[in-house]
Amino acid sequence: MCGSVGSALELYAPFRVGMSRTLPSVLVLALDTSSAACVAAVVERAEGHAGRRECVLAQRSVVAGRRHGELLAPLLSSVLADAGQQVRDVDAVAVGVGPGPFTGLRVGVVTATALGQALGVPVHGVCSLDAIGAALPGRVAVAGDARRREVYWAAYEDGKRVAGPAVDRPQVLLELGVDRVVGAGATLYAEVLLGLADPTGPQYPPPVLVAHLALGTAGTAGTAGAAGAEGLPGTAGPDRLSPAPPIPLYLRRPDAVLPGPAKRVTA
């Protein structure tokens, strides 16, 4: 298990590991491929005498580089097996919709959409940067590696998004008025960030928080904790961590360019 995922769990208290499925519950399969990692988790929200609780039945992560298409399906099979569940037990799918590089991000979103269609269950998209920023106190920016010497970023104040998501040169983060920057982009451009980079923060979106944001905003009950998102999607402002349709958030065109029409040859 990736250490950054574990640290995010410690930050967010409502999750408990090992709750049995003896109470009315919703089982969510969460995944994210917006970064260099493939991450997945099985999270359960259960109704009990003490109210609603969420727990992590299993989670896994693997640094994929550009092998998301090869590694995601085995990762999902493994995390379901770890949780003692089968794919038919899943009640909803939550997926990080980016922003992220074209190929890796598309793998996760297409897989989540296909699972939802095959199982007849809803698929909820979550901004992948929110899955990091929602659990962090204070004024913080989350930066992912956008390649081309750029970062995907969003800014948060006590778990509420106040700017972004956007794609820019890393120097733009110096103008946000944040106290620290976390994520893979912060690590990659630590020298540019002049002491704002926090290497102890999460590097990749924790799948547990992808599930939590989906549970809190998809109308399944409750709110998204520190994120403060409420109810079904609407026209929420930037400070509201709203649910999203499972559509990739690329923010820019892919590197690959489709060939133009064939040129006519004249005599």
Each model region followed by its residue ranges:
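Glycine-rich phosphate-binding/hydrolytic loop that grips phosphoryl groups
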Residues: G201-G219, G231-P248
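Surface "functional belts" at beta-alpha junctions
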Residues: P14-G18, L23-S25, A46-C55, S61-R67, ...
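Phosphate-handling active-site elements
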Residues: A83-R88, G116-V126
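N-terminal beta-alpha supersecondary unit
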Residues: Y12-V95
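Short, well-ordered alpha-helices that flank and scaffold nucleotide-derived cofactor binding pockets
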Residues: S78, T113, Q117, E191, ...
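Intrinsically disordered, low-complexity terminal tails and inter-domain linkers enriched
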Residues: S4-R16, E44-C55, G216-R240
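DPxDG-like acidic metal-binding loop motif
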Residues: A92-P122
